[in-house]
């Protein structure tokens, strides 16, 4: 998931039981995919991503970014001699059932490894802009690419450490933070690919960096009125999240996203 649940509680108001469900089933909350390809360009999708966009336009934008990110990873996997199996996208309102248990809009976008699907309530993007101060279509694109990053981790078996650690995966250097920062880095790799194809506009990367920082554990804990407690972190600090996204964007290299060991 893109952002941490504040103090193992509720970064978006999610009740404690949902945190437990997420830890038990391995769901990646807060920010997943695949559908038919589209010939519509990103510039066309941007026109639909404005404040007055309809639900259909918003769904079209999410689907486009999801497919484009998955096409990027399909090529990356081929370079590694592997086959990429795309995730599926589920758009829902308020609540839904998943292979990882009950899903709620309060959890934000999330990826469920049990059914290899990304779940998004489109209302989250309004919250991302208004509550978290991260507006813009590329802020939204970062969220989607982050969730696909979790699917990449699951496909490659990189999420096994968190499943093995269970609740003990929390903390500033825990398995949960390492996986989330890697997903941020993977989102940066997709952004790098977009830049190489001349799809980015001025300010896009700034929007993504702002979104990454907005959902840092420390910033969310302060926003919730509590003290910053690194031992309860599940996603990393605002600085870490932005830095790892930038690392993926700057390099475009899978190897640059190794968060399994070493300093974060």
Summary of predicted features, one role per range:
Residues 28, 32-101:
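A metal-dependent hydrolase signature that marks the N-terminal structural subdomain at the beginning
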Residues 215-264:
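Pan-zinc metallopeptidase signature
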Residues 73, 120, 142-155, 183-184, ...:
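Active-site recognition of the HExxH zinc-binding catalytic motif
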Residues 1-49:
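Long amphipathic alpha-helical segments used for membrane anchoring, targeting, substrate engagement
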Residues 56, 60-84, 174, 178-221:
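Short helix/loop segments within enzyme catalytic domains
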Residues 148-163, 192-195:
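Catalytic Zn2+-binding segment of zinc metalloproteases
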